[in-house]
């Protein structure tokens, strides 16, 4: 019986010792569904914002959105920052042929285009932002050279790793 209790306590102690520790987000980042997110209130062109996200955190990119739940979470996150302007996300058409890709390389299957979008207005809109007029819930293709606030997304890091 004593051996059983010792073995059980050993298993509990090992599981609490940091092995398999819960992933964490950096201070100032918000977590949801296994990812970390941060809204940056800095004006950047789409490509500069993507580069910033990559440099800010290991594995970071402009945000990719894969569900209505994630879209609602992001809309609330942006709302809490009192942002009244469009915000860059990680969707673009790199070849300028209307084939949309996420900057993190993830699959493009969920969409939330605003009515009439994408429209490639003046044949010059190949990057995508959340539209403020829709409560940041719908997407619009926009000129990549426009400067906007943006949202970065990254995998959380395990405790003890350096971000």
Swiss-Prot record:
CC annotations in GO = extracellular region
PROSITE patterns found in the cross-reference section: C_TYPE_LECTIN_1, C_TYPE_LECTIN_2
Gene3D superfamilies from the UniProt entry: Mannose-Binding Protein A, subunit A
Protein location: Secreted
Return one GO MF term: metal ion binding
Q: List the disulfide bonds.
A: 25-36, 53-152, 127-144
Q: Which InterPro entries match?
A: C-type_lectin-like, C-type_lectin-like/link_sf, C-type_lectin/snaclec_domain, C-type_lectin_CS, CTDL_fold
Q: Where is this motif: Mannose-binding?
A: 117-119
Instruction: Tell me the ranges covered by the C-type lectin domain, including all copies.
Output: 32-153
- Identify the stretch annotated as signal peptide in this record: 1-21
Question: For this UniProt entry, what is the primary localization, expressed as one broad class?
Answer: secreted
Question: What Pfam families does the database record attribute to this sequence?
Answer: Lectin_C (PF00059)
> SUPFAM superfamilies given for it?
C-type lectin-like (SSF56436)
Q: Which residues bind Ca(2+)?
A: 125, 141
- Keywords from the named record: Calcium, Disulfide bond, Lectin, Metal-binding, Secreted, Signal
Q: In which tissues is it expressed?
A: Expressed by the venom gland.
- Provide the function of this protein: Mannose-binding lectin which recognizes specific carbohydrate structures and agglutinates a variety of animal cells by binding to cell-surface glycoproteins and glycolipids. May be a calcium-dependent lectin.
Q: Which family does it belong to?
A: Belongs to the true venom lectin family.
Task: Specify the protein name.
Answer: C-type lectin lectoxin-Lio2
């Amino acid at each position: 019986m004593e051996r059983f209790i010792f073995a059980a306590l050993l298993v509990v102690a090992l599981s609490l010792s940091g092995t398999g520790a819960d992933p964490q987000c950096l201070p100032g980042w918000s977590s949801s569904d296994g990812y970390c997110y941060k809204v940056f209130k800095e004006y950047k062109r789409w490509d500069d914002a993507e580069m910033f996200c990559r440099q800010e955190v290991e594995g970071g990119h402009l945000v990719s959105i894969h569900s209505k739940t994630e879209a609602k979470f992001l809309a609330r996150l942006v709302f809490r920052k009192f942002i009244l302007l469009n915000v860059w996300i990680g969707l673009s058409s790199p070849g300028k042929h209307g084939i949309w890709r996420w900057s993190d390389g993830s699959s493009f299957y969920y969409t939330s285009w605003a009515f009439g979008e994408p429209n490639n207005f003046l044949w010059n809109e190949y990057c995508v932002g959340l539209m403020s007029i829709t409560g940041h819930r719908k997407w619009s293709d926009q000129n990549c050279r426009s400067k906007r606030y943006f949202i970065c997304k990254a995998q959380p890091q395990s405790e003890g790793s350096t971000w």
